[in-house]
Amino acid sequence: MNALIPDIDTLKKVVKINSSLPYESIEPYIEDALDIYIKPYIGKSTISKAHEDKGSDLYNKLLRALGPLTLMLESDELGVMFGDAGITVSNVQGQRSPASDTKIAAAKKNLCFRGMQALDRLISYLEENKKDYPNYVIDNIPRFCFIRNAAEFQDLGMVDIDYSILSYRIMFPTIRQLQEHNIREMITDKVYDILKEALSENTETPKQQVLIDYIIRYLANKTAELYTSQKTTEQHVAGRTIEYTPTIRPIYQDPVSYTHL
């Protein structure tokens, strides 16, 4: 039994589900949803703290993310059976018919949207209450980056992401890659180290701040270009059909090919 969602009634608080569904059909996917979608962004310590107080805001916000993501993860397997005859489904006349592929896809998309939006709100809550969750801070100490948070990505980088911390976290590896590869090619190692030290210690001079602002603007817009490029997106999600898409207002469009005209 999972301590966060110990029964179907708990799950029903955040998703629409039939009470007759055996809890054993859902249980394996709860831990998977935690490990895949939630733990990387809030850490094991924060999840353990939610276990301790089921009446806390932390638990309620975590449940609103975990419920939809659990149901999304198991929806493809729910209703099918694995046995000697292979993969089969129940075929009982007079009972409810299986939903069409279109409806299943639409339901999964909505569950993903709800779960990820709830996860974004959960992360925002933790960021706003860091003093109450010191282990969350320890578990999420990032490596040095010129863009330190979602607000800087939007305000200084001039790319609209709805101030989404989750969007920023999703794009963080790409930002770092561009920083370590492109920025280091644009400026000398000495200048890079000086800017890094100044930014880390909040001792930037006005001239240094101008250069840092330009770097942030480049990193934000180049990252957004990569994430909104149709070709990049097609390559990125080829092996994963369910993936959170960062909130970015379109700023880039692949050139249109007219060869087929």
Where in the sequence are the language-model features?
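Short, intrinsically disordered N-terminal pre-domain segments
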Residues: 1-22, 141-156
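N-terminal ordered "arm"
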Residues: 11-47
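Hydrophobic/aromatic interaction determinants used to assemble and anchor large protein complexes
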Residues: 26-34, 165-203
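N-terminal assembly/attachment segments of tailed bacteriophage virion structural proteins
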Residues: 38-63, 72-76, 80, 204, ...
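Elongated alpha-helical scaffolds
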Residues: 57-91, 217-228
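Extended intrinsically disordered, low-complexity coil regions enriched in Ser, Thr, Gly, Ala
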Residues: 76-93, 229-253
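Low-complexity intrinsically disordered segments
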Residues: 126-165
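Conserved small/polar residues in nucleotide/adenosyl-binding loops
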Residues: 259-260
